[in-house]
């Protein structure tokens, strides 16, 4: 007799929102910008329990002991998509005990064991980047677990670092299964992805050709539409085929972080287009299998003197949606602010909060704003616990209850070196915003600051964050 067992995660998004525990640890992808430092990138374990004696401290570092990786994003071997398991053998219930960290530059994929000792993760397996090249993919990015036990990772290039959007699959023991996409139709570029089995759909976004973005930001890389992201790609989930591509145009260049709503019965989502800081809403009309898009937020560029370019765009780095699907947040890495929007009306986000955390247009910088459609004066530098915030807000992670928003400062180390050399010298940071979930609004927590300036082998820069039990960007729920 078959029965349903409870796997990892939570039954529903609202179950996680209402009943999930307060986070006590954060796993933070940490990049060593000094490429000659032999310990390389690492996974930081950060204590975020306010009752702990080591609150706001990095309590463990798990080094790759390799150079040239550029760890970037991370994902789990199992999540809430595996919550409902049918069967009699409880030993076969998936466990959320492995954290996967792909490397953008080397193509190596690190699998960390976080189940044996969640405070001291260890590297369990290293998947050699040559395996990806053998499958004609490179620059692995986003990781999601699948309900069948496999793990899927998006890729952005072919074996020669030309633009190519695809996905590579691994089984539960992290043996390569091959690429996911079937048929001759492939996306021009790749980056992030999110799936919704109820609607038989997966959406994927685009950055650009690895051979280009690895060099840093260069405006001439925007000229070839086949080498720069500007499209949303929709796949039939069961058939594993690309069936619709929507070109967002110049305003939609570099659509990066893409999210469906957490509620698996709502076929709505958003994508943050980094270059010109535009937020797009996408949805499928009832009775149709085709998706539509609309631009719902447009952050205006600031005209400036004293900078490398005549305008400073926001550079929308990350977007995140609260588990109750009420609020959407995004960061503007160059303009330096974090924004909160009420998305109860999916087509008309309402700005409900804004906090500045650095950026390139600060009042004491050499950059002079000559035209600003939003602000009357340039924002002042921000200090937390006596330390000036270098760089700008980039990656985010939201607590399950939506009340704490954690933010790191690094985008991608070649770009960090280009836009924020002082952050490379002094190290990055992590801060926290306290969120009003009832009325909207955010305030900087003056007591929370994680400093990456005095690390054992020199200053480092933090990027993506995860909680041990799952979070607002790792878990996908099924309608069961």
Question: Predicted segment positions?
Answer:
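Beta-propeller domains
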Residues: 2-6, 15-95, 100-128, 162-163, 183-347, ...
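Structural signature of eukaryotic scaffold interfaces centered on beta-propeller domains
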Residues: 2-22, 70-95, 136-148, 194-200, ...
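Short loop/turn segments immediately following beta-strands, especially the blade-tip
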Residues: 45-54, 111-121, 173-174, 234-241, ...
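Surface-exposed loop and turn segments in beta-propeller and other repeat-based domains
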Residues: 57-78, 124-136, 180-188, 242-252, ...
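Asp-box/WD-like beta-propeller blade repeats and closely related beta-sheet repeat scaffolds
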Residues: 114-197
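Loop/turn-rich, solvent-exposed surfaces of beta-rich toroidal or solenoidal domains
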Residues: 266-285, 309-423
């Amino acid at each position: 007799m078959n029965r349903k067992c409870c796997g990892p995660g939570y039954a529903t998004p609202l179950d996680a929102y209402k009943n999930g525990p307060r986070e006590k640890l954060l796993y933070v992808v940490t990049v060593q910008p000094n490429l000659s430092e032999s310990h390389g990138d690492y996974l930081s374990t950060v204590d975020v329990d306010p009752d702990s004696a080591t609150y706001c401290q990095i309590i463990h570092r798990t080094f790759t002991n390799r150079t040239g990786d550029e760890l970037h994003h991370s994902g789990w071997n199992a999540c809430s998509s595996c919550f409902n398991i049918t069967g009699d053998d409880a030993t076969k219930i998936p466990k959320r005990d492995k954290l996967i960290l792909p490397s953008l530059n080397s193509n190596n994929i690190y699998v960390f064991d976080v189940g044996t000792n969640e405070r001291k993760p260890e590297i369990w397996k290293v998947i050699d980047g040559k395996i990806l090249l053998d499958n004609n993919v490179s620059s692995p990015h986003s990781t999601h677990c699948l309900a069948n036990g496999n793990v899927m990772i998006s890729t952005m290039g072919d074996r020669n670092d030309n633009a190519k959007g695809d996905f590579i699959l691994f089984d539960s023991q992290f043996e390569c299964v091959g690429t996911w996409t079937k048929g001759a139709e492939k996306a021009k570029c790749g980056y992030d992805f999110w799936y919704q089995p109820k609607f038989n759909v997966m959406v994927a976004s685009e950055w650009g050709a690895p051979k280009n973005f690895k060099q840093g930001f260069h405006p001439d890389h925007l000229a070839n539409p086949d080498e720069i992201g500007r499209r949303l790609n929709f796949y039939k989930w069961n058939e594993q085929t690309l069936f619709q591509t929507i070109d967002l145009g110049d305003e939609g260049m570099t659509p990066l972080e893409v999210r469906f709503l957490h509620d698996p019965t709502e076929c709505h989502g958003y994508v943050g287009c980094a270059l010109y800081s535009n937020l797009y809403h996408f949805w499928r009309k009832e009775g149709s299998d085709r998706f539509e898009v609309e631009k719902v937020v447009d952050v205006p560029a600031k005209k400036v003197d004293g900078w490398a370019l005549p305008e400073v765009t926001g550079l929308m780095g990350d977007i995140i949606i609260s588990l109750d699907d009420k609020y959407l947040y995004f960061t503007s890495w160059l303009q330096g602010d974090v924004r909160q929007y009420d998305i109860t009306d999916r087509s008309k986000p309402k700005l409900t909060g804004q906090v500045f955390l650095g950026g390139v247009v600060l009042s004491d910088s050499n950059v002079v704003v000559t035209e600003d459609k939003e602000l009357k004066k340039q924002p002042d530098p921000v200090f937390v616990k006596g330390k000036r915030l270098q760089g700008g807000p980039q990656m985010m992670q939201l607590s399950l209850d939506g009340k704490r928003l954690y933010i790191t400062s690094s985008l991608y180390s070649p770009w960090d070196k280009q836009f924020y050399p002082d952050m490379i010298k002094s190290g990055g940071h992590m801060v926290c915003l306290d969120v009003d979930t009832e009325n909207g609004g955010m305030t900087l927590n003056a007591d929370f600051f994680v400093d990456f300036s005095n690390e054992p082998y020199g200053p480092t820069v933090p990027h993506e964050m995860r909680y041990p039990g799952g979070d607002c960007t790792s878990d996908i729920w099924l309608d069961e």
